[in-house]
Amino acid sequence: MLNQKLNPTPSEDLTIDVDLLYETDPCELKLDEMIEAEPEPEMIEGLPASDALTPADRYLELFEHVQSTKLFPDSKTFPDCAPKMDPLDILIRYRKVRRHRDFDLRRFVENHFWLPETLSSEYVSNPENSLKEHIDQLWPILTREPQDHIPWSSLLALPQSYIVPGGRFSETYYWDSYFTMLGLAESGREDLLKCMADNFAWMIENYGHIPNGNRTYYLSRSQPPVFALMVELFEEDGVRGARRYLDHLKMEYAFWMDGAESLALNQAYRHVVRMPDGSLLNRYWDDRDTPRDESWLEDVETAKHSGRPPNEVYRDLRAGAASGWDYSSRWLRDAGRLASIRTTQFIPIDLNAFLYKLESAIANISALKGERDTEALFRQKASDRRAAVNHYLWDDENGCYRDYDWRREEMALFSAASIVPLYVGMANHEQADRLANVVRSRLLTPGGIMATEYETGEQWDKPNGWAPLQWMAIQGFKLYGDDMLGDEIAHNWLKTVNHFYQEHHKLIEKYHISGGTPREGGGGEYPLQDGFGWTNGVVRRLIGLYGEP
């Protein structure tokens, strides 16, 4: 074993055991010999700002001490704490007293930090309420008002009110928010829709992209790019005109396509991959390659057992978090072994479908504004992406979309992500019909559709069903005329959520839907969360379409 030091300090060295036998892939080595497949990204200018450092950056060995000793059961707790004084003073005090015989780490943290509040956990539901009434009464509980930024806190202040998912998640999340907004619109909460629209536009203006969430430790990555879908929702519900967001959509697109023009064949830079035929497709990425602040110990342990350079594993874990599917067999070389994660080596079908929607939205809004050159440019970009997706990610033999491993030049696993091209109108009718058959036979259950057909212990795999996947499948199949399948998924999901609600009087993050009575979904790095933003949003929208279950 080799002892590898992480941020050693004069006072003490923290050592982590790392296997010397790195996992090597002949396909990857051959590609690396031919060309520098992944040039090192440059740091984004202006980030992080002086008050946007992550807790790991600020507290150095104190942060590692707290996280490595598991002072809090949830690794996210300490990064969400706010300091009671200048972090530098805290660090100096820590270095002075930590070697004292009577030093108590917990007491030190409690004396120098404000612990995060968990407001939604205090809510007690009324068992007499219908499912619809329960959701409508939860919106105020999950709403956070704009407040003055606590100096040096990891929470990024936003100008308007916003919805949080609930439980341990006390900040807003990018792609979660879109599915939450569906329910807000159905509940007549245009006020909150406007606030959230302004918040996301503000983040694009100030950070150049929409971060994973409004925490400093989320700034280095985004999440599935659904702002174009949000804009469409605002337009449909008369909340905000789509035209006002054209510049924001262009800025987000520039973030995802950064570096594309200079890429050679078989080369990747940040989110973009230049394929062997010259076409451009995208992958998930994080600009940092260190353990995530919010899952520090889990990441260190995963990397330790990987047999790979730790920074590679950390990057792939972070990119997996950026995907929203954290974690799934989609990103694993060996199903069931998180240490085999290779997120940055996969071209995801859902990401490229969302970017197709972004390109199409820019073209459509440019047409409304009379910007013909921009319209033509982005229609061509959308057409090119669609052709590349059909070439690399459509499995014609099996009639489904699949992710693509660009390093090995082979298709990856089938998952419910394959329905996103239907949701954004990217597929043709033959593809939609064939995909419907595959979803019916491999993912559909009496409780809804599962994330994948592979049981790995990860939360975005069998046996779990998730609200956003149900919504996109329902609407996607109905868009292509398969009302029967769309309605079946909708009724199955409403039955699942209502059955659990009648027993437990709450909605949760994910559900176990593979056989038997629907129950709490398992897997993942943290306990099951209730609340729950996007489940509430999707179910509230479905109740508006189908009535109470």
UniProtKB/Swiss-Prot annotation:
Record-annotated membrane-spanning stretches: none
Subcellular location per the Swiss-Prot or TrEMBL entry: Cytoplasm
Pathway this chain belongs to: Glycan degradation; trehalose degradation; D-glucose from alpha,alpha-trehalose: step 1/1
UniProt entry keywords in alphabetical sequence: Cytoplasm, Glycosidase, Hydrolase
Single GO molecular function: alpha,alpha-trehalase activity
Gene3D superfamilies from the UniProt entry: 1.50.10.10
GO biological process: cellular hyperosmotic response; trehalose catabolic process
UniProt-annotated catalytic positions: D326 (proton donor/acceptor), E509 (proton donor/acceptor)
Entry similarity comment: Belongs to the glycosyl hydrolase 37 family.
Protein name per Swiss-Prot or TrEMBL: Cytoplasmic trehalase
UniProt gene name: treF
